[in-house]
Amino acid sequence: MTTKKSAEKKLVSIKKSPKSLGKPMKGRDILVKALVNEGVTVIFGYPGGASMEIHQGLTLAPKIRMVLPRHEQGGSFAAGGYARATGEVGVCLATSGPGATNLITGIIDAKMDSIPIIAITGQVPSTVLGSDAFQETDIMGATFPLVKHSYMIQNVAEIPRIIHEAFHIARTGRPGPVLVDVPKNIQQQEGIADFDVSFDVPSYRPNLKPSILQCKKAAHTIQAAKRPIIYAGGG
């Protein structure tokens, strides 16, 4: 005999286990799988306390090669160089605080030169954000004018969507850097994530059609120039 209580329990179980969901995973492993799904094969990362869980997850991902720079800034520039050389999105990884701020020069370079990179930073646990915790830095605020977009992951279930969005934003329109900040407790937290994600970013609609007026003006300027020089590649 099926009671109302057991029927409700069964219904909840069905709702929590659609076909696109798998077994519970740590946030770090969900993040790594999301990166693999985006085709990432190389990450340039310098480990630290707030990002160590992600590094542990990467040891279980044979498809991703981990390159250890001597300094986080070198990692961000290496990610940019990798993107230039391969046409793929470069990925760099650093811990919180000084590790994250050391990425900034490479992030600025990517913004100025229209290079698609994803900068992933470890962060102090979300439960102590704003308490001046050890090596806590508002890296989202520090890089706000330097990136196309930035995220702080607050729930393991949203990791696949955020990573998918970050790569889409980095590589489309005028390419550029995107920051993904991941608190340590989110890296450690277990949850069930849906990797069959779709997204819609209403505020992000890059205009890929050139202005006819601007094209005519450029053509007239080139035609009238005696010694024209074209400097191309600014995105």
Would you name each region that the model predicts?
Residues T2-G235:
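N-terminal alpha/beta PP-like core and its mobile active-site loop of ThDP/TPP-dependent enzymes
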